[in-house]
Amino acid sequence: MKKTMLMFILSVITSFSFIFSQALPGTLNWYNGEGNGMFTEVAYKKILSKKKSTTVVVAVIDSGVDVEHEDLNGHIWVNAKEIPGNNKDDDGNGYVDDINGWNFLGNKKGENVDKARLEKARIVSKYQSIYENGDAAKFANDPMFKLYQEAKASVEADKEQFAPYMEMIGKGMFDKETEEYLKDQMEYNLNPAFDDRSLIGDNPDDFNDKFYGNGNAEGPDALHGTHVAGIIAAVRGNNKGGDGVADDVKIMSIRAVPNGDEHDKDVALAIRYAVDNGAKVINMSFGKGFSPNSEKVQDAIAYAASKDVLMIHAAGNDAANVDEVPNFPHKPLVDQPSNLSRLMFLNIGANTKEKGKKMVADFSNFGAIEVDVFAPGNEIYNTVPQSEYKNLQGTSMAAPMVAGVAALLKSRFPAATMMDICNAITSTVKKYPELEGLCNTGGVVNVYNAAMALEKKFK
């Protein structure tokens, strides 16, 4: 669950990639409404409520999900082939007691990783002894040396930016949450010496070592993942928090995102787990600037695309142009021959309910090539652990909007492939001049328009 440096420097109080605020009466479901919303309710009323429904499984690769949340009741995936608590791999998939998903951030003892380093700190730790004690000229043509130099410079720059704020800790200038964030950055996220993997006991560079972790689909900090799950699947019409976008969906919780940067291996295996266990949509509300094993993640993305699984990814919260600044994982590049993978991987920017220039969320990444569509990601009121609700914002919230739309459309048009669903979503956006040049469609996802397009194709 990456927390964004830029957001912190710009405003200490809004330093997180998802931001707390209070829900306002009458705005709980603005994202499903008209205006800058997705016209979800119109689609239900005029088209979708009249059609039979088939349940769709959506994998949420995230920090974990509170599978007992009151507003997710009936919408959590259950592995019917697995017998709970018998400590056996009943279905033979290699994962023991994976009842509601899998946790790649734990061990067989039931212990779990919470905090982790940023990837750039891991790179510094791994290569420092090699490159710092050698002749720089000797490594001039070594691509890992270049990666190490970039990672080291970035870590040092971040520490320098944080230094003035660290001096203010304990002086009553910050609230408890902000102080904890600052301490986490220095003690864990930006600390090359912090070991975030020994508890798990695997080799994070050995992608053939697959069967680690445990069946705890919630983990120690499921706030982010639970909110994401609620946007997709919260019970509709019960006046408990915001309504989920989809009404006939099961959430498969795959825990692979700590408080820090996710490991490439965990992401790649999480994608493959989702595909192999029946998910048709995968939501990925995370990202990072360095990815030393990105080709392995690309292989997993290609595998998902080959199985007709649609991947939805948050564009990121650095207010940056991702055509120029990498945000991993990403779709295959334009000049690479993996066209199917590129088409089946959507990057999502975040819009607000405001008009004009304020329509684009000030934190949202953008890109005329790499970002596909925008979706509501500001002031989103939905589920958090312990059957509670909070208002959060970020492209982390925009991505599950689109994942929910994809699941909803697939549930009503089961004959459609996920490629059909993807094309319907991207070709029917509601265009806004404010989004021209910020994404390749120039618009916000519109459920009603997409449903009409599919209705014509699959009568």
Predicted feature descriptions by range:
Residues 1-5:
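Positively charged n-region of N-terminal signal peptides that target proteins for export
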Residues 44-57, 65-263, 340-344, 366-370, ...:
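Subtilisin-like serine protease catalytic core
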Residues 62, 316, 394:
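Active-site glycine-centered loops adjacent to acidic/histidine catalytic or metal-binding residues
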Residues 17-23:
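Boundary at the C-terminal end of the N-terminal hydrophobic targeting segment
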Residues 23-28, 117, 135-153, 159, ...:
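Short acidic, glycine-rich surface-loop motifs adjacent to enzyme active sites
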Residues 7-17:
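Bacterial N-terminal signal peptides
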Residues 275-277, 281-284, 295, 341-347, ...:
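C-terminal subdomain of the subtilisin-like protease fold in secreted/lumenal serine endopeptidases
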Residues 309, 331-411, 415, 419:
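Extracellular S/T/G-rich loop segment that most often corresponds to the catalytic His/Ser-adjacent loop
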